[in-house]
Amino acid sequence: MTQPLFLIGPRGCGKTTVGMALADSLNRRFVDTDQWLQSQLNMTVAEIVEREEWTGFRARETAALEAVTAPSTVIATGGGIILTEFNRHFMQNNGIVVYLCAPVSVLVNRLQAAPEEDLRPTLTGKPLSEEVQEVLEERDALYREVAHIIIDATNEPSQVISEIRSALAQTINC
């Protein structure tokens, strides 16, 4: 199986952490769309949003998704990538989409423990727990709609990777 694997889910679900280790375990290349975009523009996500608003960032995110999609690649996407209909169809039609699902409390705890998350622009201007709740309520149905595989991401990364690998084996063998 050489299809790209797209990891989707909200901030804090473990897309980058799991993605790097999953790519290593599958002997694949790993790309994080946000990191790729930041390296291409030499700007942080916050700087891109400040300069181009969310609309401009979303357009760049789509271009990044298309640019990094390649066989034998694990791609950690930005949490809002599913907001653009083109991106949802693109991922569904060009690879296997894995939704890393986690409850609000887990996401908030992870985000509070990661100081680099302070560099991310707020989506709602509300306190973190309210923002995570609101954003997840808005996006969960879209994550589920686009996903070929849904994984409980509350476990340790090694367990999440094991579950993804099992689900991939079942997907390929059906």
UniProtKB/Swiss-Prot annotation:
CDD domains: SK. ATP binds at residues 12-17, 120. Substrate binds at residues 34, 58, 79, 139. It is found in: Cytoplasm. GO terms for molecular function: ATP binding; magnesium ion binding; shikimate kinase activity. It catalyses: shikimate + ATP = 3-phosphoshikimate + ADP + H(+). Residues 112-126 are annotated as: LID domain. Its EC number is 2.7.1.71. Pathway: Metabolic intermediate biosynthesis; chorismate biosynthesis; chorismate from D-erythrose 4-phosphate and phosphoenolpyruvate: step 5/7. One of its GO terms (cellular component) is cytosol. It is an enzyme of class 2 (transferase). InterPro entries: P-loop_NTPase, Shikimate/glucono_kinase, Shikimate_kinase/TSH1, Shikimate_kinase_2, Shikimate_kinase_CS. It comes from the Bacteria. GO terms for biological process: amino acid biosynthetic process; aromatic amino acid family biosynthetic process; chorismate biosynthetic process. Its cofactor is Mg(2+). Keywords: Amino-acid biosynthesis, Aromatic amino acid biosynthesis, ATP-binding, Cytoplasm, Kinase, Magnesium, Metal-binding, Nucleotide-binding, Transferase. Its main location: cytoplasm. Mg(2+) binds at residues 16, 32. Pfam families: SKI. Binds 1 Mg(2+) ion per subunit. Belongs to the shikimate kinase family. AroL subfamily. The LID domain closes over the active site upon ATP binding. Catalyzes the specific phosphorylation of the 3-hydroxyl group of shikimic acid using ATP as a cosubstrate. Monomer. This is Shikimate kinase 2. It comes from Escherichia coli O7:K1 (strain IAI39 / ExPEC).
